[in-house]
Amino acid sequence: MPRNEKKTGQSASPRKLRVGELVRHAVAEILSQGGVHDPVLETHLITVPEVRMSPDLKLATVYVMPLGGKDEKPVLAALEQHKRFLRGEVARRVNLKYAPDLRFRIDERFAEAERIEKLLRTPAVQKDLSGEEET
């Protein structure tokens, strides 16, 4: 189930999705252009695959992943340290009534996809997929 869906199965509103995409583009642009002067952030390429907005659009959960999946904790700490600056930059680039507060989280989807791939390659699953029956 995508992160934007509530446990009841309702999908996120189109406005939340649109604003989340605008914030995602703004954060990704700031990070890619070297707008934050931090040694950790300057030495890492950071992808921003998703931003999830709260219903009132005042809180943005920004999912990030350093390229290569290494040094997640230092990158997250550096982003947290500069979150006020990033919030101000997002406010300048995205026209909203309130600048959303940014919360940074590591995107776990890549690790989860790799774990599932590894499970699918196990002999027991390969046997099930090929249609062989146990006797």
UniProtKB/Swiss-Prot annotation:
GO terms for cellular component: cytosol. InterPro entries: KH_dom-like_a/b, RbfA, RbfA_dom_sf, Ribosome-bd_factorA_CS. It is found in: Cytoplasm. One of its GO terms (biological process) is maturation of SSU-rRNA. GO terms for molecular function: ribosomal small subunit binding. Signal peptide: none annotated. SUPFAM superfamilies: Ribosome-binding factor A, RbfA. The keyword Membrane does not apply. Its main location: cytoplasm. Keywords: Cytoplasm, Ribosome biogenesis. Belongs to the RbfA family. One of several proteins that assist in the late maturation steps of the functional core of the 30S ribosomal subunit. Associates with free 30S ribosomal subunits (but not with 30S subunits that are part of 70S ribosomes or polysomes). Required for efficient processing of 16S rRNA. May interact with the 5'-terminal helix region of 16S rRNA. Monomer. Binds 30S ribosomal subunits, but not 50S ribosomal subunits or 70S ribosomes. This is Ribosome-binding factor A. It comes from Rhodopseudomonas palustris (strain HaA2).
